[in-house]
Amino acid sequence: MDAAKYHIILIDAIGTGESSKPSDGLKASFPRYNYDDMVTAQYRLLTEGLQIDHIRAIIGFSMGGMNTWLWGIKYPNYMDAIVPMAASPCAMNGRNYITRKFISDSIRKDPAWQGGNYTEQPKSAQFATIYYNFATNLGTAQLVQKAPSYVEADEMVAKAFAAPYTVDANDILYQWEASTDFNPVGYQNIKADILVINSADDERNPIELGVCAKALNEIGHGTEFLIPAGPNTNGHATTFNANLWKDAFAEFIKNVPHGNQ
């Protein structure tokens, strides 16, 4: 997306970054939220706060990709295009949910969590985050290449634990539990042009399930750009490397009509 041509708006979703979150003061008294709440808040920010009545495209990765699917469903006339990356339009299920549950349960069952009203950060948050990152990220082939034996693997794990960890446990807990009821029902009614960008080695969105292909067939329009696994891919994190998909996106957005209403 050409920043000289378009205004690019980057939003910290509820519970993340500089947006409102438990660590701002309320701790466990902070209201629960889900992905639907995130999208509603983003829409109100754009329409009420910035007074923008139509946008060119909604683009998001992972959680942002799931938010992007919801955008297309909840506000079908608001954008010309949606570009969900590393995200499947289906209910949270299987390994994707189970591994997230490990994060929340490890924090909630940690005595140091104290019902969310701790004075020192429970160590379970760091442990669960590192586990989840290795389990559902980085790419299977890449991990084997970087850790061909237990020696290198031990070094990688030790390095991960030695790195500074400043994320608040309640913030992490709320963020992951926000995805629990994700279920983009009604995607068949999406009107915006669609470019789905996924990678063949995405651990959280296995291509063998065919979820995106099925959804696009039911929607009746849209394209999936699948990045083949290779030396420059990193599993779920593959789309961090824009060089792998920027040409496909540029060609797509060039052909999307303006002002889809």
For each feature predicted by the language model, list its residue ranges:
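Conserved alpha/beta-hydrolase "acid-adjacent" motif
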Residues: 203-211
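Alpha/beta-hydrolase-fold enzymes
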Residues: 78-162
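Short glycine-enriched nucleophile-adjacent loop
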Residues: 65-76, 82
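Active-site nucleophile elbow and catalytic-triad environment of alpha/beta-hydrolase enzymes
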Residues: 170-186
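Catalytic active-site module of serine/aspartate enzymes centered on a nucleophile-bearing elbow/loop
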Residues: 214, 219-261
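Active-site machinery of serine-nucleophile hydrolases
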Residues: 1-37
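Short beta-strand/loop motif that positions the catalytic acidic residue
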Residues: 190, 196-198
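Conserved acidic catalytic loop of the alpha/beta-hydrolase fold
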Residues: 36-57
